[in-house]
């Protein structure tokens, strides 16, 4: 599971997920990419589930890049605990996703196979996605 090795602070405030992704919005490593068109947060488990779906579908062929990293800790209080008494403990890590962010990239496989693999991975996410190709400038 992806998570930071060390952080400056153990817990963070909730914050707001606004705006569009400008960094990481282009396919820069592979030939094809899976780009988010919706906004939300993706957990480390969902990122791993998507990676597994892609890897299994392409039968371990080609090269895959994961372009998102879960760097925000999410805290939860245990069940049946009253409010107050401080912030809960860190339960899982998420990556905040803005529209336009490229989530995965792949090369070394056909476009049809890449589309099928990314469709399988997209089913694991709570955000809407689209298939994109690398544009040569």
Curated annotation (Swiss-Prot):
GO BP: translation
Entry keyword RNA-binding: yes
Short name of any one Pfam family annotated for the protein: Ribosomal_L16
Secretion signal, residue range per the UniProt entry: none
Record GO cellular component, one term: cytosolic large ribosomal subunit
Sequence segments annotated as region (Disordered): 1-22
SUPFAM superfamilies for the chain: Ribosomal protein L16p/L10e (SSF54686)
Molecular functions per Gene Ontology: rRNA binding; structural constituent of ribosome; tRNA binding
The entry's keywords: Ribonucleoprotein, Ribosomal protein, RNA-binding, rRNA-binding, tRNA-binding
Bilayer-spanning residue ranges: none
Record's function text: Binds 23S rRNA and is also seen to make contacts with the A and possibly P site tRNAs.
Subunit relationships: Part of the 50S ribosomal subunit.
NCBIfam families linked to this entry: rplP_bact
Stated family: Belongs to the universal ribosomal protein uL16 family.
Full protein name: Large ribosomal subunit protein uL16
Lineage of origin: Bacteria, Pseudomonadati, Pseudomonadota, Gammaproteobacteria, Oceanospirillales
